[in-house]
Amino acid sequence: MRVIVFFDLPVITPENRHNYSVFRKYLIKSGFIMQQKSVYSKLVLNLTNRDSIVKSIEKNKPPEGLVEVLTVTEKQYAKMEIIIGESKTEYLNTDERLVVL
């Protein structure tokens, strides 16, 4: 299961930019991987884990802007189609439960 976070935050004032930076660093520190500029994803094992992550995001949300969370299964995530560009291979993109490295 994957938790995908989409956000659109204002960056007009220095305070806005600071809030953006703090939120982005929080996501990275929490184990999220950048998919696109404002789209981050994280692998979760179950719904309980997902719920705790969402609560943590709510606790660390910036004061302004839009933050959305979408949860998809690994099978759904693996079926994502790339229309243009290349997928980063820094992480595995599979729905297999056992991965041998």
UniProtKB/Swiss-Prot annotation:
Pfam families, sorted: CRISPR_Cas2
The keyword Magnesium appears for this protein: yes
GO biological process per UniProt: defense response to virus; maintenance of CRISPR repeat elements
MF annotations from Gene Ontology: metal ion binding; RNA endonuclease activity
Domain of life: Bacteria
Co-factor(s): Mg(2+)
EC number: 3.1.-.-
Binding site for Mg(2+): 8
Family: Belongs to the CRISPR-associated endoribonuclease Cas2 protein family.
Subunit description: Homodimer, forms a heterotetramer with a Cas1 homodimer.
Protein name: CRISPR-associated endoribonuclease Cas2
